């Protein structure tokens, strides 16, 4: 009897969380640029870095932005941001739901609640 071995290879996407970490890092290192019109005819508009000359030129994989992001901590009806004031947060979390991050350094109030409900338990 003969034996047969096959090898199958395929490409998979990285885990969603890994992509999120990479995007977050790129977002925090994004470069502020401004659009500048070329002075000569038939030359395209180009982007100029709005940092000191010591700053390196962005690579093709870097993120750049033209306008600064709004302050999502404060309510802003023009952007539709409701802000973070009054939202529930997790005091012990170091993620997006954590009080230190969500409350934007403004501090927060803690409340302790006791909830009583009928559980239909049998002993």
Swiss-Prot record:
Record's keyword annotation contains Glycoprotein: yes
Lipid attachment, kind O-palmitoleoyl serine: 1
Intrachain disulfide bonds: 89-104
UniProt subcellular location: Secreted, Extracellular space, Extracellular matrix; Secreted
Coiled-coil residues: none
MF-aspect GO terms: cytokine activity; frizzled binding
Domain of life, source organism: Eukaryota
Post-translational modification: Palmitoleoylation is required for efficient binding to frizzled receptors. Depalmitoleoylation leads to Wnt signaling pathway inhibition.
Any one biological process term the GO annotation gives: cell fate commitment
Keyword Disulfide bond found: yes
Region of interest (Disordered linker), ranges: 33-61
CC per GO annotation: extracellular space
Key words, A-Z: Developmental protein, Disulfide bond, Extracellular matrix, Glycoprotein, Lipoprotein, Secreted, Wnt signaling pathway
Residues carrying sugar: 90
Function statement: Ligand for members of the frizzled family of seven transmembrane receptors that functions in the canonical Wnt/beta-catenin signaling pathway. Required for normal fusion of the chorion and the allantois during placenta development. Required for central nervous system (CNS) angiogenesis and blood-brain barrier regulation.
Homology family: Belongs to the Wnt family.
Protein name, per record: Protein Wnt-7b
């Amino acid at each position: 009897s003969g034996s047969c071995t096959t090898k199958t290879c395929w490409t998979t996407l990285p885990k969603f969380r890994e992509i999120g970490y990479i995007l977050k890092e790129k977002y925090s290192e994004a470069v502020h640029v401004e659009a500048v019109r070329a002075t000569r005819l038939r030359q395209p508009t180009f982007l100029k870095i709005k940092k000191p000359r010591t700053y390196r030129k962005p690579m093709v994989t870097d993120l750049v932005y033209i306008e600064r992001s709004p302050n999502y901590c404060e309510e802003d009806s023009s952007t539709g941001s409701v802000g973070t004031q009054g939202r529930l947060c997790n005091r012990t979390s170091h993620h997006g739901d954590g009080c230190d991050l969500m409350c934007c350094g403004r501090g927060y109030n803690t409340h302790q609640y006791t909830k009583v409900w009928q559980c239909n338990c049998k002993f």
